[in-house]
């Protein structure tokens, strides 16, 4: 990973045009080729970005006499011909790190057990539900559970111990990807957790995702209230 803190301006040229005026920003270049531009706000969200596959060409900027100005132009281009044109005026800091291969998200014991129990008792989501498989592989990571509802339609289930907005966003990305598969679509979503935050529930319902609160003890066969559907 390459991290560059620099004063720069950015122009996006593609389906539409956008401009970021000169300011100090973080430029992040990942090993997969992606490039993103960050400000010191917006949490994890970049101001602009280009996802792989894309190319990055860096060219020194010269004046009319052909002398180097100390600035450089980064041109990031994807296969569609869309470009990020980053004019780097001054580099404050630049570091490179080899992070190696990431092991991926490791669920805590309760989440993993919830997934196992729900897969064994998939009809807790509704009569007629059948399991396709756990940890259904996709290009952006495994879906916790893939199953079919009583109408024979595909359902993707994301399981969390405590369900927040990040979990809903993750499930949304899975649904967008899975619904491109002619053999699977339409794919519906279920967000299942022991506790679902109100903001996450509102966002999920707005996106047509069903929320399910899971009673861990009940799924383990210990006397408790049954799971509640919203």
Curated annotation (Swiss-Prot):
Keywords: Cytoplasm, DNA-binding, Endonuclease, Hydrolase, Nuclease. GO terms for cellular component: cytoplasm. Its main location: cytoplasm. Its EC number is 3.1.-.-. It is an enzyme of class 3 (hydrolase). The keyword Nuclease applies. CDD domains: NucS-like (cd22341). InterPro entries: Endonuclease_NucS, NucS_C, NucS_N, NucS_N_sf, Restrct_endonuc-II-like, tRNA_endonuc-like_dom_sf. The keyword Nucleotide-binding does not apply. Cleaves both 3' and 5' ssDNA extremities of branched DNA structures. Belongs to the NucS endonuclease family. This is Endonuclease NucS. It comes from Corynebacterium glutamicum (strain R). The gene is nucS.
